[in-house]
Every structure is written in structure tokens, then in C-alpha cells.
Amino acid sequence: MAHQSIEVNLPLAKVYECLNSPVDFPRFMRRIDKVNKINSQTYEFVTQIGDDEYKWMTNIIDDLRNTRFAWITINGNLNQTGTIRFTPLNNGSRTRIDFSLDYRTFFGEPTEELNEFITNTEEQLGKDLDFFREAVENGTFKEQSEEKAEEKEQTAV
């Protein structure tokens, strides 16, 4: 399981607001292409690894406002579990994020690309959290997501 921590120069409530919905994960997690909300507790994740598309459904198993957010895979061709913990710092003016993420295959040996994807989770999670911190502290978190969506639309045309 990959684990990374980062401190953000924003109040806890603002940081939690940006991280408590998996639909927003592609805004900073470079290896997640898309997340679709199925209902209030269920989300479909989609990513491309090598030549293969991976899809999996997750359920939110813990959502304690401004404290903790967690999910598990319920079906799909890739198993993902994650937990995000939020800790206020400096009388609430800053926030520490503790992010744990794990990927596993449901069956058989992974392809070379999938094995690399799983093996590099910790390093990539650190890069993703650095990107998140920069975007959220600069107030560009939502803007970068819109630009990314526009780029995907243009390349699809």
C-alpha cells in the first residue's frame, strides 16, 4: 500500500471540500482518466494502462466530514482501496493530508504495464499530491480540470 503525506496552506474545510468526491480525483491524479458518479456512494473509475482499459466500481465506506474519507472496489478489472485523513495544523490555518492508496489485480499475473502501474503507485501519489497542493493553494484546482477536459475533447475530435 502506498502512503504519502503533504501539508497544504489552506484551512481543513477547504482541503476536504476538494478531496471528498472521487469525481474530482482526475483533476490531480494523473493516472486516473475519468470518474463517473453512479449514485451518492458508488463511483466508476476508468484508466488506460498500456493497451488495456481498466474500469472498476467503488463504494464510499467512510465519510467523516473534515476528518476521513475512504473507499473500496466492489467490482471491476482492477482493485483499488483508498483512505484520506485530514488533520488541522496551526490552529486550522493549514492542513495535513495523509493519503493511502492500494491497487491489486483480481486474478492472475499482471501485464508488464499493469505491474509497473502498481509498483509505481507510491512515487506517483507523491507527485499527484504535490500537484494538488500547488493547484489548490494557487486557486487553480477547478480551472486546471476544465483545461484538461478541453484538451481531451480536442484530441478526441
Give the ranges of each region predicted by the language model:
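Residue-level preference for beta-strand/loop junctions
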Residues: 39-41, 52, 78, 93
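Short, hydrophobic/aromatic-rich segments at coil-to-beta transitions
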Residues: 37-44, 63-71
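Short beta-strand micro-motifs enriched in acidic
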Residues: 38, 61-63, 85-91
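Beta-strand/loop substructures that line and gate deep hydrophobic ligand-binding cavities in soluble
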Residues: 74-127, 134, 138, 143-150, ...
